[in-house]
Amino acid sequence: MDNVLPVDSDLSPNISTNTSEPNQFVQPAWQIVLWAAAYTVIVVTSVVGNVVVMWIILAHKRMRTVTNYFLVNLAFAEASMAAFNTVVNFTYAVHNEWYYGLFYCKFHNFFPIAAVFASIYSMTAVAFDRYMAIIHPLQPRLSATATKVVICVIWVLALLLAFPQGYYSTTETMPSRVVCMIEWPEHPNKIYEKVYHICVTVLIYFLPLLVIGYAYTVVGITLWASEIPGDSSDRYHEQVSAKRKVVKMMIVVVCTFAICWLPFHIFFLLPYINPDLYLKKFIQQVYLAIMWLAMSSTMYNPIIYCCLNDRFRLGFKHAFRCCPFISAGDYEGLEMKSTRYLQTQGSVYKVSRLETTISTVVGAHEEEPEDGPKATPSSLDLTSNCSSRSDSKTMTESFSFSSNVLS
């Protein structure tokens, strides 16, 4: 997120043109109140919603799947950015005066890039996981430990990418106010600044969206456009339907992110083409609207999960059960939905390889949690009743194979 704040300083053209001029971006009180209400909605909805998402996944063993760990990372990044940067962005954009000191100036320009990087590459990791599970079902899947390592690598790369902008951030005292700005090394045509901003835009927007778009296109063709050979039982179609729902949900999440951030990146690349853009009187209102849209991307995912996924909906209902207009629902579904799947897995082993190996991110008939209980031959004996010894052995071996490819 190059410039969420870096170029906040550029919003005031007098920073780079005439540091003795007073702040020319002043708006009536009623506009400030309306914008304040709009930004407050983002902070409250994002922080509360994403914290509930993290609780739903981490507090329920059946929800601790590999891909759900990436959703936890996504929720953490978005809640953090909403909590630490949205209000500061708003106050600085409205008053064009920095109240928070040098340290927070550096953090303010540094953290949003890291958070957006972590968010989009968490979505990329989910897309890659879906791609491998559906297109290459027999390939080894990430373990819980490997998933945590990937998340750590994402954050290390995010911090490295954001470091230059934080390092060169500084405050400057003017006759009537203090501003937070970025002092890039001197070079003709601001080459360092341009190269950095273009690289950041490519790395946190266009490149990951290209990868995600390819992955979900191939997955979509496989799940919707192709006739999948094998057993055509109701159980089989039920599982494929569940997988389609999850892919639809993640596509909505990615498209929402892309739509929210596109105007922001365009806004901060245009001045390299038209340097006088920030001198326009209307630019502050345009910036506030574009920044609100970008920041609002942090609050939509919990709403999407709640609307499109049954198990998240149960979790949200339980979290807000104290509200008079919300019914708690069957909270046990969060823990028990996977149990039925576990008990019946052996009996549906004969369906196609795709059915036994595709796993979903969340919802009924999902992948088993990495740290969840594993099925044992004895549990299969309970479902097969008085089967012969040879039948029991066959079912045990079949289930063992199925469990291996699902994990």
UniProtKB/Swiss-Prot annotation:
Disulfide bonds join 105-180. It comes from the Eukaryota. The keyword Membrane applies. GO terms for cellular component: cell body; cell surface; dendrite; plasma membrane; postsynaptic membrane; sperm flagellum; sperm head; sperm midpiece. PROSITE patterns: G_PROTEIN_RECEP_F1_1, G_PROTEIN_RECEP_F1_2. Keywords: Cell membrane, Disulfide bond, G-protein coupled receptor, Glycoprotein, Lipoprotein, Membrane, Palmitate, Receptor, Transducer, Transmembrane, Transmembrane helix. InterPro entries: GPCR_Rhodpsn, GPCR_Rhodpsn_7TM, Neurokn_rcpt, NK1_rcpt. A lipid is attached at residue 322 (S-palmitoyl cysteine). Residues 364-407 are annotated as: Disordered. GO terms for molecular function: substance P receptor activity; tachykinin receptor activity. Residues 1-31, 87-106, 170-194, 271-283 are extracellular. Residues 55-64, 129-148, 220-248, 309-407 are cytoplasmic. It is a multi-pass membrane protein. Glycans are attached at residues 14, 18. One of its GO terms (biological process) is positive regulation of ossification. The chain crosses the membrane at residues 32-54, 65-86, 107-128, 149-169, 195-219, 249-270, 284-308. Residues 376-407 have a biased composition (Polar residues). SUPFAM superfamilies: Family A G protein-coupled receptor-like (SSF81321). CP-96345 binds at residue 197. Interacts with ARRB1. Belongs to the G-protein coupled receptor 1 family. This is a receptor for the tachykinin neuropeptide substance P. It is probably associated with G proteins that activate a phosphatidylinositol-calcium second messenger system. The rank order of affinity of this receptor to tachykinins is: substance P > substance K > neuromedin-K. This is Substance-P receptor. It comes from Homo sapiens. The gene is TACR1.
